[in-house]
């Protein structure tokens, strides 16, 4: 009797545990869609949270794969041109000093080292590919010889070598006006046909480009304090204005959203008179821990994104209080795998990673659009092993798009400026679904009703909404991969969001 009763009790416990596990299995990566009840959405198309003013764009970081003669050069710049992106950000970066620093040695004995022969081809290809659109230029590296170091910092003879050692020193060796003069000459090369060097010799370029935006430095390299950065900004800006008077300026470019930088920089009293504060910028990268799998990436990294959005709201309170006319660009957004950073031979990146990363960018973009951020830039067009390959938007072997590129393209083509944004409500009883996917309804200026759906997990999620039948779907998922988004027309009021999928549904009628 006691044994039988014990078995009954054990059986009951097992049944309860199975029911418990069944209810929570979606959070653990179960892939069977048949066991999910569709999550029901309710949309009030009149409840407009914000009219979008947010532009989705990208950054282009200079590296050897962008040089003429690179096997992927033509494909990469063709893909850049096809995006037709406003505010594309162009950043020659310090690991390639011969591709981004125009004066590698200090002037001496009547001679200078100004040399644009390797720099110009990439700059001009970028300007041609983005012609007709406002661009952001950021030559982010102050020449190393301007910094105090125990000994001279060597420059690799090979321009294609990755050299993270070039960035050294925390105190300037030269006056700030010398730094400003470097950037004045650099901009004059592209905007005013050339410049006179430190000895009065004229260097002719023949370039007369209109530089719409210039971002001053990047990520507080050299451990710049808020005060020192602001002094540099206040010297560089008028120096550039003297040769390119219509250029507007972007400040900070912070890697970490440290409030002290925003509070100091946005305080008008901290600046010289008449210094413009047109834009501020800062960055966000998420990423899973090294021991995570694709099934757990989403739960961790989307939580990181939520933390970042909370910080954005705080930064916005500072901006609105101190400098409300200053606009904002979050001009680096991406994910980084710890096993695919700067290792010369990184671990293989799973194919699903590109979808996961694209989904995170779409989510951050949508959330920042609701916050009224002006520009959101995906990072970055081209990367490769040894140089953060997990942020690349194209295949570094072919130059063809991956899913990250296609997600940006999907957002650009379907969420125009002026769209009225209305976050849907998840019906009572289905609240758990909100942690698994994201939805944003929008009414475009052309009166089309659309629904953005983002799967935060590596399993399929069914969504139900009255009126979905007849909707046209464009989705970036593992099936479409780096190809154009898949298209389908729904035959019922239900849609199953693919694993880490990003879909735009255009409703009929």
How would you name each of these model-derived features?
Residues 287-342, 399:
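Glycoside hydrolase catalytic-domain groove-lining segments
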Residues 24-84:
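N-terminal carbohydrate-binding accessory modules
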Residues 1-10:
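N-terminal Sec-pathway targeting helices
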Residues 58, 126, 186, 214, ...:
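Conserved, mostly hydrophobic/aromatic
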């Amino acid at each position: 009797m006691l044994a039988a009763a014990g078995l009954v009790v054990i059986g009951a416990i097992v049944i309860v545990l199975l029911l418990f596990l069944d209810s929570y299995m979606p959070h653990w990566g179960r892939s069977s869609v048949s066991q999910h009840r569709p999550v029901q959405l309710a949309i009030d198309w009149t409840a407009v949270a914000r009219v979008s003013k947010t532009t989705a764009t990208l950054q282009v970081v200079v590296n050897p794969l962008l040089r003429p003669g690179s096997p992927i050069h033509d494909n990469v710049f063709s893909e850049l041109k096809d995006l037709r992106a406003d505010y594309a950000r162009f950043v020659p970066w310090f690991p390639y000093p011969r591709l981004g620093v125009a004066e590698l040695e200090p002037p001496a004995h009547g001679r200078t080292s100004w040399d644009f022969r390797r720099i110009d081809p990439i700059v001009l290809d970028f300007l041609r590919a983005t012609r007709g659109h406002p661009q952001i230029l950021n030559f982010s590296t102050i020449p190393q010889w301007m910094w105090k170091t125990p000994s001279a910092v060597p420059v690799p003879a090979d321009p294609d070598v990755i050299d993270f050692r070039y960035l050294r020193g925390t105190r300037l060796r030269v006056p700030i006006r010398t730094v400003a003069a470097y950037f004045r000459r650099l901009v004059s090369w592209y905007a005013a046909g050339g410049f006179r060097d430190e000895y009065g010799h004229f260097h002719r370029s023949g370039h007369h480009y209109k530089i719409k935006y210039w971002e001053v430095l990047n990520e507080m390299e050299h451990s710049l304090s808020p005060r020192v950065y602001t002094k540099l900004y206040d010297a560089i800006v008028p120096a550039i204005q003297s040769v390119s008077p219509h250029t507007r300026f972007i400040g900070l470019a912070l890697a970490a959203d440290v409030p002290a930088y925003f509070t100091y920089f946005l305080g008008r009293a901290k600046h010289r008179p008449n210094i413009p504060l047109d834009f501020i910028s800062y960055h966000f990268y998420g990423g899973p821990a090294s021991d995570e799998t694709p099934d757990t990436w989403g739960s961790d990294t989307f939580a990181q994104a939520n933390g970042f959005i909370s910080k954005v709201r705080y930064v916005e309170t500072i901006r609105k209080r101190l400098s409300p006319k200053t606009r904002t660009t979050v001009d680096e957004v991406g994910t980084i795998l710890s096993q695919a950073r700067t290792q010369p031979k990184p671990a293989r990146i799973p194919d699903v990673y590109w979808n996961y990363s694209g989904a995170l960018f779409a989510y951050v973009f949508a959330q920042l659009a609701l916050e009224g951020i002006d520009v959101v830039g995906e990072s970055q067009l081209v990367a490769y092993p040894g140089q953060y390959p997990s942020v690349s938007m194209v295949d570094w072997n072919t130059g063809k798009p991956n899913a990250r590129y296609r997600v940006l393209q999907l957002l650009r083509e379907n969420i125009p400026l002026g769209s009225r944004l209305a976050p849907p409500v998840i019906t009572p009883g289905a609240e758990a679904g909100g942690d698994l996917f994201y939805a944003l309804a929008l009414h475009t200026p052309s009166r089309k009703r659309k629904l953005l759906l983002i799967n935060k997990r590596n399993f399929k999620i069914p969504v139900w909404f009255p009126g979905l039948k007849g909707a046209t779907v464009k989705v970036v998922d593992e099936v479409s991969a780096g190809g154009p988004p898949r298209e389908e027309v729904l035959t019922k009021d239900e849609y199953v969001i693919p694993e880490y999928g990003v879909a735009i549904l255009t409703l009929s009628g």
